[in-house]
């Protein structure tokens, strides 16, 4: 596949509207994504829209990668002109890597309980740069009792966990986790290692580190061969060492969650929605222009969640925004001004290039 040249990408100084990127998955979902985008339902097993993705599915050469309007892969475009896309400070810290993956995720059924390794574990056992800390910003819930499950309620010893997984005792695994009711607007940080699942009917924006690494603790009813696909190729004896088996008390668990309106204001109409501990992995802002909101230059992914409006940059005409739009904003687009009637969006950002954020 021919890569774009630097000249092809150097002219990118304005936001780009992105279409859906729906790799097939093993669990059901996708209808909420189609409704959100006002598009036909593509399939009942496309529950994830990988937005502005520089990442492939685990074990795949290209599946999962996003294409830009006109055809080039985002990964190739960024490699050709990293400072245009990411900004000099980001490139100094992370290289030509966005350090971010964003998804729309529609749980058409409860996901199997699983977890993701951290950076150190991934480097040691897989030779990869990124583990997978993630977060969820809840857009909608399909049931009145919508919930996620995460974190063991009590310490679980290695032998007990290994036995549950070997026997595929789904009831014991799920029953050992905290059940956390959720509603639209909630934001939850999911640290690497913590076992978790998203309940049926929950529709989220997922921000995560740019990897597709999962250790499956449960697969019995999901059409997966866990003995072959569930352990990242290292075997379960090693894979289960990435699991956080500690007990999560109520106060510790509550530190991972922010309800709508409980975030940190970073400017007029802009609210940081995740706990501060998320900033070293990614940042998420809820933007509601009143009547406008100004955003500093940064590589970012915009998910328009309500209303309509415009996005202005220093180059070219204003872009119209409507609910369901997803846009990629290069760093070179500069400062952005948002205006609109009932406009609301989630702005997804990579880790701050200077380390600890000052917000």
Predicted regions and their residues:
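A short beta-loop-beta micro-motif enriched in histidine and acidic residues
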Residues: 97, 108, 125-134, 175, ...
């Amino acid at each position: 596949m021919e890569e774009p040249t630097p000249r092809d990408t150097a002219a990118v100084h304005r936001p780009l509207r992105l279409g859906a990127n729906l790799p097939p998955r093993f669990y059901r979902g996708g209808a909420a994504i189609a409704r959100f985008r006002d598009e036909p339902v593509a399939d009942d097993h496309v529950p994830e829209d990988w937005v502005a993705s520089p990442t492939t599915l685990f074990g795949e050469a290209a599946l999962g990668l996003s294409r830009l309007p006109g055809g080039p892969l985002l990964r190739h475009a960024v490699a050709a002109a990293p400072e245009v896309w990411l900004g000099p400070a980001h490139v100094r810290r992370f290289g030509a890597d966005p350090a971010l993956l964003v998804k729309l995720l529609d749980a058409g059924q409860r996901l199997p309980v699983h977890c993701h390794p951290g950076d150190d574990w991934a480097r040691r056992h897989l030779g990869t740069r990124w583990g997978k800390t993630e977060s969820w910003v809840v857009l909608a819930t399909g049931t009145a009792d919508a919930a996620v499950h995460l974190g063991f309620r009590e310490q679980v010893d290695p032998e007990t966990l290994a036995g549950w997984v070997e026997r595929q005792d789904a009831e014991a695994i799920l029953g050992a986790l905290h059940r956390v009711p959720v509603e639209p607007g909630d934001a939850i940080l999911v640290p690497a290692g913590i076992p978790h699942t998203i309940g049926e009917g929950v529709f989220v924006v997922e921000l995560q580190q740019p990897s597709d690494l999962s250790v499956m603790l449960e697969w019995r009813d999901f059409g997966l061969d866990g003995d072959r696909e569930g352990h990242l190729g290292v075997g379960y004896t090693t894979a289960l060492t990435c699991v956080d088996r500690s007990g999560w008390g109520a106060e510790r668990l509550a530190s991972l969650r922010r309800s709508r309106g409980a975030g940190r204001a970073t400017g007029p109409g802009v609210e940081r929605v995740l706990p501060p501990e998320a900033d070293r992995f990614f940042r998420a802002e809820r933007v509601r222009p009143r009547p406008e909101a100004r955003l500093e230059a940064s590589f970012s992914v915009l998910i328009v969640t309500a209303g309509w409006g415009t996005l202005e940059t220093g180059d070219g005409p204003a872009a119209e925004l409507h609910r369901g739009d997803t846009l990629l904003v290069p760093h070179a687009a500069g400062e952005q001004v948002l205006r609109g009637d009932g406009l609301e969006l989630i702005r997804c950002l990579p880790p701050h290039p200077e380390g600890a954020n000052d917000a």
